[in-house]
Structure formats: structure tokens, C-alpha cells
A protein has these predicted regions:
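Sequence-structural signature of mature extracellular/luminal beta-sheet repeat domains
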Residues: 26-375
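C-terminal segment of classical bacterial N-terminal signal peptides
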Residues: 21-23
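Initiator methionine at the very start of the polypeptide chain
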Residues: 1-2, 26
Length: 375
């Protein structure tokens, strides 16, 4: 998990099971021999990306994983016997799940390579309507030809998405911006596109502070050739803060960030980095200091997105699946599946939802999402 030419998938591929690549439509080239390993850069896009369609899934959903308990305290968060279910397939590469609404709400997620946002809602009993539908396409880059792709982009669509400002704030990595989407009209408004006169790399993930500030990460994973992309304007990958007036503050420029989260009381900021999961102190004004290692990379080997539950536990993608780490930094359990998991989201219906390569998974939990104003 070192620097150089490495893709977003490479961060979590090293320890994943070596399953054969799914066949994608002709426009979406696949890499032979299973998931890309460390040092791999995916081929440039040559056209719109389209995954092979899959039949819709209805309850009872197929079970594709299980829970491993590493500490007895895990039982307070999730039942070790709860199944890990596949609820939706047919993605090229799924990211950024976000729950909208209450118990009967719905899940939105980004298909980053296909440049669309997909909506999933639990089907009503007896329904034959497919529960997964395209909600917005293109979700990110449009381009002068309106085809929604470009050869200099690995992932033209949105990535991380959060509820904020009474709508949706997205890491619009295809456009290299942070943007707001109105949930009713689906109109997109750019909030920030760069810092000190230079464009962002490709914003990746975000988290909302209770005071309305938004912290986000800016690695180059959306660009072709990632760290070596000639389109990069910044010579660093930053952690930033988007202020309520849409001004931008640089938090850290010395790490290679990916996922990001805040403790329930907003006094701790967590960021995944190649060298491990970092934690910072956050003061009452939202200023950040005292970076230190929270979990070393050697403990879980690579990572991607993360979420903090209402009790302060971290649920983060890792080599094994979703590692569950308590506030003291101890890994107490793992959600394992038969393919990579990039990140997760807590639904108001009592489930944790997981983005896993070309599909969505879920598992019943005993914790919930942190409630914050505007979310």
C-alpha cells in the first residue's frame, strides 16, 4: 500500500478473495485475473461504462457473508449470527452510499465509473417493481459532447455523498468539485472547485460537522494515472474544510487521504491514509490539530471509506471487509463478504449498507447513524 501508480481499488484489493472479474459490457473493459493488485492503474476510459444487467432481487435476499467476533463487546453492536445479504447488483463500481429519510426511506449510491446515482428502496411485500433505479445520470462529468466520460478520468461520476444543508452534498470527482444536489429537483450547484487558484484533484469523501462545516478528502483516484496524472494542479493530496460561506480551509497536505469521519461530539476527525487511520483533535471552532495514528495500516492492511456510529465506533473498509473498531482503536469485529467492500452507511431502518464492487450489501445492526442539523 505504497505510493506510485495505484488505483482506488488497489487500496483494498490486496487481501480480498481472488474472485474472477465480472463480465462487463464492451464499453467497460475488465482487468484479467481478478481484482487489480497494488501498483495497478486501470485502463483509460474509451467510452461510457455499462455493467452487465442483473435480475432484480427481492426478499429473502441471498446471503454472501458473515460476521466475525474478535471481542465480546461486538455483541452490543451487531449480532454475530446476522446474515450479510446482497440486495442489488449491476454496478460497474459502487461507492458513496447515503440514506435519505426515515425508516421507510431509501438509499442512494454512486456508480462512479458509470457516472450515475442509483436509488434503492426496500420493495413492498408482493411488489414486482425492481427496487433499484437510476436516480441521476450523469451524476458528475458531462463534457462538451454530453457523453459523460473523458479519457483522462478513471471515475467520471460522483463518489462520496452525505446529507447536509437539507439536501445532498457530493464529492463530485468527475468535475473535481464539491457540489450540492437538491433532493426534489435534482439540480446540482457547485460549492467549491479548488484552493488558492488550483483545481482539486478529485474530491472523494465528506463528513458533516454539527456546526455546518463539511470536511472532505481530495485524492486523485478519479483521474487516469491517479498520482501521475498530468491534469493534477496541486502537488499534494489534501484534507479540506468547506465552511458555511463555501470558503475552503486546508486541514492537512502531508497525507494521502481517502475516507473521513467525525466522532459523535465532533471533537475527533478520522481520516484513512496509506500508513494507517489518522485521528485529529477538533476544537469548538472546527479547527483541527494534533494528528496521530489511530489504527496502523499493518493492523488491517489498506482501507477506503469509513462511518462512525452513534456510539463512536468506526466501521471502515479494510482488507477483510468492514472492520469494526471501538473508540479506543481496538478492532472488535469484521463483516466479511465474498468480494471487496469499499464503504458503508447506516440506514434509519436498522441496517448497515455496504458498497461492494458491483453490488450493494446489508446487515442488521444495533447502532445508528449520527444525527446532525441539516442532514
Amino acid at each position: 500500500m505504497t505510493g506510485g501508480n495505484i488505483s482506488r481499488r488497489s487500496l483494498i484489493a490486496a487481501g480480498a478473495a481472488a474472485f474472477a472479474s465480472r463480465a462487463l459490457a464492451q464499453a467497460a473493459p475488465t482487468l484479467p485475473g481478478g481484482p487489480p493488485g497494488p501498483g495497478t492503474v486501470r485502463p483509460p476510459l474509451t467510452g461510457p461504462q455499462v455493467a452487465t444487467p442483473e435480475p432484480p432481487l427481492f426478499p429473502p435476499f441471498p446471503v454472501v457473508g458473515s460476521i466475525e467476533k474478535l471481542d465480546d463487546s461486538l455483541s452490543d453492536l451487531i449480532d454475530v449470527n446476522t446474515p450479510v445479504e446482497k440486495i442489488l447488483g449491476g454496478f460497474v463500481w459502487v461507492e458513496g452510499p447515503v440514506w435519505v429519510g426515515g425508516k421507510d426511506g431509501y438509499l442512494l449510491c454512486s456508480d462512479t465509473r458509470a457516472n450515475k446515482i442509483v436509488k434503492w428502496q426496500m420493495p413492498k411485500k408482493g411488489s414486482t417493481t425492481p427496487p433499484g433505479q437510476t436516480w441521476l445520470q450523469p451524476s458528475g462529468y458531462v463534457g462538451p459532447d454530453h457523453q459523460g466520460w473523458a479519457p483522462n478520468l478513471q471515475e467520471p461520476g460522483t463518489n462520496g455523498m452525505i446529507r447536509a444543508r437539507n439536501g445532498l452534498v457530493v464529492a463530485d470527482q468527475g468535475n473535481r468539485t464539491v457540489a450540492f444536489i437538491d433532493l426534489k429537483t435534482k439540480k446540482k450547484t457547485q460549492l467549491a472547485s479548488g484552493f488558492e487558484g488550483k483545481r482539486f484533484n478529485s474530491p472523494n469523501d465528506a463528513v458533516l460537522h454539527s456546526n455546518g462545516m463539511i470536511y472532505f478528502t481530495d485524492p486523485p483516484f478519479g483521474l487516469n494515472n491517479v498520482f501521475n496524472s498530468p491534469d493534477r494542479e496541486m502537488d499534494y493530496t489534501g484534507v479540506f474544510r468547506l465552511n458555511p460561506d463555501n470558503s475552503v480551509t486546508l486541514i492537512d497536505k502531508t497525507i494521502r487521504p481517502n475516507g473521513i469521519g467525525l466522532s459523535p461530539d465532533c471533537t475527533k476527525l478520522y481520516v484513512t491514509d496509506f500508513s494507517g487511520w489518522m485521528v485529529y483533535d477538533v476544537d469548538a471552532r472546527g479547527d483541527v490539530s494534533n494528528r496521530r495514528v489511530f489504527v496502523p495500516s499493518s493492523a488491517v492492511s489498506g482501507g477506503d471509506g469509513l462511518k462512525i456510529d452513534n456510539r463512536g465506533n468506526m466501521w471502515t473498509s479494510s482488507r477483510d471487509g468492514i472492520s469494526i473498531i471501538n473508540p479506543a482503536g481496538k478492532r472488535i469485529g469484521i463483516i466479511r463478504a465474498d468480494d471487496r467492500i469499499s464503504n458503508c452507511e447506516f440506514g434509519a431502518d436498522g441496517y448497515v449498507y455496504m458498497a461492494s464492487n458491483h453490488r450493494l450489501l446489508r446487515a442488521k445492526v444495533k447502532v445508528s447513524k449520527i444525527a446532525r442539523p441539516g442532514a
